[in-house]
Amino acid sequence: MKKPNLFVWLILAGLIKIYTFFLGLKIVKKVNIKGPAIVLGNHNAFMDYMFSTSALYPRRVTYLAAAKMFKEPHRRPFLKLGRAIPKTMFESDLGAIKSTFEILKQQGIVCIYPEGQVSYHGTSLPSPYAIAKLLKKANVPVYVCLIKNAYLFSPPWSKRKFKGRVQVELSQLFDRESLSQLEEAQIYEKVSKAIYFNTGAFNREEKWSYRVQPIQGLEPLLYQCPECLHEGLQAKQNTLACPACQHTLVYDAYGFLNGKSVYEWFQRQQSRLIETIEKTEDYQLSIPVRLVRYVGKGLGEVGQGIFSVTKDKYVYQGTDKGSTKRYEFLTKVVEYLPVDIGKNVQMYYDHEIYIFEMNDPIMTTKMFITGEYYYQLSKTKS
């Protein structure tokens, strides 16, 4: 594994830096980063890699990226040019670890988003504990690239840009000496605290404003009316409206809907679903899906069937490449269920991917809330 080509990096990363400059990116450098080093970032938007690349320029950075992204035609060429390291999500990947250490031995800089996926509601997600083990073993200086309000500028539920301010702050979290003295649990706690960012709480204080755009794409995430509890809010311009009682949430220039952040509304909705799960004996969800897996160098639909979640397991019953299959995944071992809001949920097992595409956008949100709750429930009983 080699660091990114210097010539290619200076050109491509330079173009990214110019692009983000005109977008209004502000960079606050509290440190000068030199390799070998690991940079950790919070992950609230798909554009985060652009913001961190700009902040670290002209330093060459090697990114750890989800292995499935290397199978996506619109992303693969850029990942290859940048010599990114493919990483299987939410399971041990010895190949990715080996490549990471090879870059560090070359005095390189490796950038990791420990959350493993973009935060769909604008507040940092819990990071897998494995990040603490990696940092402890690597024993190189660790820095934080904290990206503020990228969620409001480029929300993951929209293809639109909500023009406004994004700020990146670079700071040091650990040096070699502190890493050698800390236990893994202490490292994990400090990492979690350092990369935590709550968009709503931050902007309630700072009041950075953004150009309001239509918010189509938010309704699969915030699907329930807070007044009558009807499921199926409808997005129109910058509003979410309930077709049953006409209650309307208005998205404003500060990223709030009727004074509350997306995360606050999501938490309320999540709590109501969990309450329903707890009150319903043998609560489960089932939905028709299209199964997508690795096919050659890409991703392709390989079958159709029913995907369900119960207290004990996820089950896919259907076809896969012409054969009838039944795949089971225990909820007690699936801590995180990655989701593309409104599109699919994903399962990673033995370096394979199972993408369950759904026609009902709301079910993607209900499925991951239910599955991850059952995981937490299994831990309290063990």
Task: Report residues per predicted region.
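A conserved mid-domain beta-alpha-beta active-site/ligand-binding segment of alpha/beta enzyme cores
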Residues: F174, A185-L221
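Short, surface-exposed beta-strand/loop "edge" segments at domain boundaries and coil↔beta transitions
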Residues: K297-G300, Q317-K325, H351-M358, I362
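Cys/His-rich short segments
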Residues: V212-K260
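Soluble catalytic domains of membrane acyltransferases
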Residues: P4-N5, L12, I18-E189, V212, ...
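Acidic, Ser/Thr- and proline-rich intrinsically disordered linker/docking segments
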Residues: F329-S382
